[in-house]
């Protein structure tokens, strides 16, 4: 579990992209 932070980053960007 080393890409845990990366996954959170993707999840955050995913919502941002949808809003944008």
UniProtKB/Swiss-Prot annotation:
Main location: plastid
Domain of life: Eukaryota
Cellular component aspect of the GO annotation: chloroplast thylakoid lumen
Protein localization: Plastid, Chloroplast thylakoid lumen
Record keywords: Chloroplast, Plastid, Thylakoid
Entry protein name: Thylakoid lumenal 22 kDa protein
């Amino acid at each position: 579990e080393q890409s845990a932070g990366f996954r959170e980053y993707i999840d955050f960007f995913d919502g941002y992209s949808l809003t944008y």
